[in-house]
Amino acid sequence: MSRWSVSQGCGNSHKALTMAGHGEQLFRGWGMVRPSMRSEAERLRSFSAWPRTCPQPSPVEMARSGFYYLGPGDRVQCFSCGGVLRSWEPGDRPDTEHRKFFPSCTFLQQQQRDPGATDSQILGQHSGEEPDRTWESVYPEMAEERDRLDSFRNWPMYAHGNPEHLAGSGFFYTGHRDNVKCFHCDGGLRNWEQGDDPWTEHAKWFPMCDFLLHVKGEAFIRRVQESLFRSPESSPDSLGSYIYDRSPASSPGSPESWRYLQSSVAQDALQMGFKQSLVASLIQSKFLLTGSSYSSVSDLVTDLLVAEEETHSTESVSVSRAPTRMERSEPPKESAPPLSTEEQLRRLKEERMCKVCMDKDVSMLFVPCGHLVVCTECAPNLRHCPICRAAIRGSVRAFMS
């Protein structure tokens, strides 16, 4: 174990790279260097890129002790004091090493005074007030459990899932098939199967929901997220070639870039059909600029769609401007007349039109296939993507610019 604080060597350059514009002055009174990692669940998610060759301690122990994964290698950083540790060895305990090298850490000191306190309670004591959490629900009219339960009056007989359990877990029935939504975070789930536990699914897909955190606590979310890390499905060896296509055309190009494809968020994007090189590039860029990875598939997909659009625009301009041998050696052929403005607008409107109702604009991205072909009103009626016929597990709202 060796110490590497943010005030030494490479630490200074890293701080200058990652701290600018991320609330250092605002949160200084709280003693937080990385406020975005103040949640234990969020710190645990950062370890999705933790090298599999690294020995213990486990990501769960790291996150519980205030550390999130910084990289490269086995470098971790405390969200509160900014202390960085690396060169972990078997038998090392994160809390012990934290106390050994950074004894003045505010988070560590408060944790020692109140071992049972959650991150949110500790942060509230840092600032002398309640933790900064907005409890503005997306659907405040469904904040009462009895109102959510009333929404299940027309719950289909064929649908799996107990309405009382679903309502108690924050979900209300949307009125379409077996689609439910969380009143607070707007997270939507469908295609319920026998044995699915609403709270577990809530923590699996929407771990940052404040209602979930308030009712179940960080320990529950941590256990659910930890089970995802240990799941055989997350192992590269068990993933199909359609996810990890190692052909030169799609390879990110370097072992360092390959590391960014190990997270569950990256794997979901790859399953949607996005290029490995583009996914790795975006995740790597975000990590270098902010010091953290994407926390949700929707954020990554939004950036991927923008990046693809920019790439296509650049390629079309390059192709139109690049002369070819044929253009220099042969007389130009008659080209089709340019499209009128009205025709261009008609085609653009047609591309953005919902392929089901043929009326409203497309706005819902299906998971896991990634197709964007229907509007908000038509999406709940579908169980399979109309393009590829893949089963729809979830959907993400997309905003067209």
UniProtKB/Swiss-Prot annotation:
Effect after changing residue 254 to D: No effect on caspase inhibitory activity or auto-ubiquitination activity. No effect on protein stability or anti-apoptotic activity
Effect of mutating residue 235 to D: No effect on caspase inhibitory activity or auto-ubiquitination activity
GO MF annotation list: cysteine-type endopeptidase inhibitor activity; cysteine-type endopeptidase inhibitor activity involved in apoptotic process; ubiquitin protein ligase activity; zinc ion binding
Entries under PANTHER family matching the protein: BACULOVIRAL IAP REPEAT-CONTAINING PROTEIN 7, INHIBITOR OF APOPTOSIS
First-listed, main subcellular location of the protein, grouped into a coarse class: cytoplasm
Gene from which the chain derives: birc7-a
Biased composition range(s): Polar residues: 110-124, 248-257
Family of the protein in this entry: Belongs to the IAP family.
Biased amino acid composition, Basic and acidic residues: 324-333
Outcome of swapping residue 231 to A: Abolishes phosphorylation, but no effect on caspase inhibitory activity
Domain notes: The BIR2 domain is required for caspase-inhibition.
Effect after changing residue 251 to A: Abolishes phosphorylation, but no effect on caspase inhibitory activity. No effect on protein stability or anti-apoptotic activity
Alphabetic keyword roster: Apoptosis, Cytoplasm, Developmental protein, Metal-binding, Phosphoprotein, Protease inhibitor, Repeat, Thiol protease inhibitor, Transferase, Ubl conjugation, Ubl conjugation pathway, Zinc, Zinc-finger
Zinc finger (RING-type) boundaries: 354-389
Cell membrane recorded as keyword: no
Biological role: Weak apoptotic suppressor. Has E3 ubiquitin-protein ligase activity. Weak inhibitor of caspase activity.
Subcellular location, record wording: Cytoplasm
Record protein name field: Baculoviral IAP repeat-containing protein 7-A
Enzyme class (EC, first level): transferase
Mapped BIR repeat ranges: 43-109, 148-213
